[in-house]
Amino acid sequence: MRKYDAQPARSVSGAIAVPGDKSISHRSLMLSGIAEGTSEVTGFLASEDCLATLTAMRALGVHIEQPSATEVVVHGVGLRGLRDAGSALDMGNAGTAIRLFTGLLSAQSFDSQLIGDASLMKRPMERVAKPLREMGADVRTRNGTPPVDIGGGHSLRGIEFRMPVASAQVKSAVLLAALYADGATTVIAPAVNRDHSERMLASCGVQLDIEGLRTTLHPPRALANQRLNVPGDFSSAAFFIVAGLLGAAGEGLLIRNVGLNPTRTGLLDILRSMGGEIDIRNPRESGAEPVADLLVRASALRGVEMPAALVPLAIDELPVLFIAAACAAGETLVTGAEELRVKESDRIAAMSAGLESLGVAHSVLSDGMRIEGKPSGPAFSGGEIDSFGDHRIAMSFTIASLRAAKTISIRDVANVATSFPGFVGLARSVGLDVREFAA
């Protein structure tokens, strides 16, 4: 088992760039693989999750070169060119991959099976399987969780699907299946959620009609190849944004080339409403995505009630928001975040256990948390906490060391490599005192 020891650190500074966006990296491999011709991707995130997708696409017959860790060249086989992998496809810990592959493979001529690690095998899959079955797919789960068995050779039909919860993974799975359907497919979301799939499909030449929360996909004859530069992952930048707010020295902490897709940046809105000084500099476009540099300065934060509309736009960043809330003046209330309970861990329970161990006053709700902050002096006592094998829990409590009285020891951190290889080195480069070792 791997472990972090994060010593108290009082300031961070410098200029950094975070690794490429995980969501976009997954999708770049899948869409390039079923496109015509050769696609080039730079800024690719070579994390365990994305490498699981790369390995699976190769097993499905797609030739992929990797000139460097952050570059991939994908030789597309076309919409109908995937082939039987011959054995189960192992998604590792990648929830995005298993859900998107379920949609993509539901339209193929061959049978497939999707499996993963112990954590992934507990993740809910019926939310994806149900609309795909409505389209005519043969998708089977084991009591609602993986392994996922997909029968090949079924003709799919376009449907109108109203998502019961705002989930970009479910929406994307349906849209990938819809590429092969007879007739248009419409997905209606209950709230705004990530739109990377729509942006990337459009850049591949797919006709999409988008009106508010309603997205209609018209099946294409083919997907065009692309040259894609993946921006820095906002979810990875989130840890350093909060670090800068808690302890940036001098002129602040600069985070370069961060993807600022408006369906991902709810954390920016909530942190600014808490008094956070975050300047957006050099805004620009990178492919279909908005990108900018962020300058973060140390700020006196105040507790707020998080607007419900921002929750789906910040769902992966809520663990580190809880760290910021523990350092804010007054109370912070987050509700409507029940989706946290079915991530890599039950993130509400995992964060509560860590906050309890570190002496933070809080109360747990079924769909969120209420946190009483401590704006001056150490907000965290120090001690040992368990990440429950969840990368975002481990990294969030590492950031807490900026306001800790004593060392924070974090157990079970190997899964940080699923999303943020090199996290410890980057954290140390800005001034955090964190070390990784075998427990």
Listing of model-derived features with the role each one plays in the protein:
Residues 1-439:
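Structural preference for solvent-exposed beta-strand-turn elements
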